[in-house]
Amino acid sequence: MSRIQEAFKGKKAFIPFVTCGDPDLETTKQIVYEMEKAGAALIELGIPFSDPTAEGPVIQGANLRALTGGVTTDKIFDMVKEIRQNTQIPLVFMTYANVVFSYGTERFLEKAKNVGMDGLILPDVPFEEKEEFNIVCKKYGIDLISLIAPTSHDRIRMIAKEASGFVYCVSSLGVTGTRSAITTDIGAMVKLVKEENDIPCAVGFGISTPEQAAKMCQSADGAIVGSAIVKLCEKYGKDCVPYVAEYVKSMVEACK
């Protein structure tokens, strides 16, 4: 059983996201350790990109701050290597096709494997174009995580059939960010996925409160939160670690 599958075993998974290098990589490292202590099941690490099309203003701002601070993909790989000396929590990169391309797809995935990454999410790569990445991901034992949006049933089934690791169910069309209400029928999406593939489904985009997380976890296997955490990093800078830990703890409780 892979580390990702293990993360969903017998429990609902809370999956936090953090932008690497906002405010700096040392703080990101401490955030990862504290998130695990607070009960996170799996952690998404955002590799900053200058044009993050799927992101709302909060995560766009974090990308900009990290890049301005001199964060590079190589420095992030070094950070993950250090993290792996202290924890075996599943780690998944979230970034954009361009970041992987410009590094060299093969080189990127070989390095990801060597430092101990478990998965990769590329929100700007549609299902029809994922194969060139998927072949290399499979070669290195990295799960390429599929995103499923509230679109047609046939499309959801088609994507679910080939999904690996877990399925990222997008709660609403549009960019990431916090929303006051999520109206998508997550239960129906999850049901369609499970009919095709016995794979965990986690819901993201727009979740920020424990109430929302609890509601999502009634029908899904986990909840993913990014913007609400990145807001704390922005607000408190290098002092954000205890605030993030506290927030993650409350969300983990809500997901139970």
Language-model features: locations:
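Catalytic cores of alpha/beta
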Residues: 25-35, 151-161, 203, 207-223
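Glycine-rich phosphate-binding active-site loops on the catalytic face of alpha/beta enzymes
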Residues: 40-51, 117-121, 126-129, 171-177, ...
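Active-site beta->alpha loop and helix N-cap motifs at the rims of alpha/beta catalytic domains
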Residues: 47, 60-122, 255
